[in-house]
Amino acid sequence: MAVVSLSEMMEAGAHFGHQTRRWNPKMSKYIYCARNGVHIIDLVKTALCMNNAYKWTRNAAKGGKRFLFVGTKKQASDVVAQEATRCGAAYVNQRWLGGMLTNWTTMKARIERLKDLERMESSGSIAMRPKKEAAVLRRELERLQKYLGGLKGMRRLPDVVVLVDQRRETNAVLEARKLDISLVSMLDTNCDPDLCEVPIPCNDDAVRSVQLILGRLADAINEGRKASNNEKN
């Protein structure tokens, strides 16, 4: 049984690629045709890739692997946070800060700083400071929450990065590959499938398409973790 049906993908607009002049030739095997100057993705192949991605992700979760969802474009931001939270994964949905993976020691210290500031705010410690100092601390807290809030539960580097729009998240791709971290990537027709272990050819711009794909991957992670817990018990 398919993880995601052709009708679901059609309704979500998962088959719409980019303009033909913006394509990456390496995506040709996933393209069905071109209409009105736009590439149409072969959803039969997307369904096969999703079956593979679901199985791969489920097995990774069952094996105790840690996941990081990354998608910083506006239309993906809320979905990334929602689905990552639902399956207990870390996420980056605002801006990829250089060194988030390759300079993990420094990034981890910034996350601890965020936690400290949150404790200070909730305890009323910041409110007791002089007005100017309190304002500075709250601005720092707001900035750290915006960019690092989704990483608070990430104590170590992830084993798998799940990407929305591989082309946009170039720095995340480079850092993950440098550290041999596996990539599960939603790939539009302008992407390079050779850069990831688990490709999912689909429209990475439409909110419903992103919701559909990330939702299934989150399901796979939850299912894998549940299977792992059942085996332990």
Curated annotation (Swiss-Prot):
Question: Would I find DNA-binding among this entry's keywords?
Answer: no
Q: Which InterPro entries match?
A: Ribosomal_uS2, Ribosomal_uS2_bac/mit/plastid, Ribosomal_uS2_CS, Ribosomal_uS2_flav_dom_sf
Which species does the entry assign this protein to?
A: Prochlorococcus marinus (strain MIT 9312)
Gene Ontology CC terms, in alphabetical order: cytosolic small ribosomal subunit
Q: Which UniProt keywords apply?
A: Ribonucleoprotein, Ribosomal protein
PANTHER family xrefs: 30S RIBOSOMAL PROTEIN S2 PROKARYOTIC AND ORGANELLAR, SMALL RIBOSOMAL SUBUNIT PROTEIN US2M
Q: Could you tell me one molecular function GO term of this UniProt entry? A: structural constituent of ribosome
The domain of life for this entry's organism is Bacteria
User: What's a Pfam family this protein contains?
Assistant: Ribosomal_S2
Q: Span of the secretion signal?
A: none
An example of a Gene Ontology BP annotation on this entry? translation
What gene is this protein translated from?
rpsB
Q: What is this protein called?
A: Small ribosomal subunit protein uS2
The UniProt similarity line reads: Belongs to the universal ribosomal protein uS2 family.
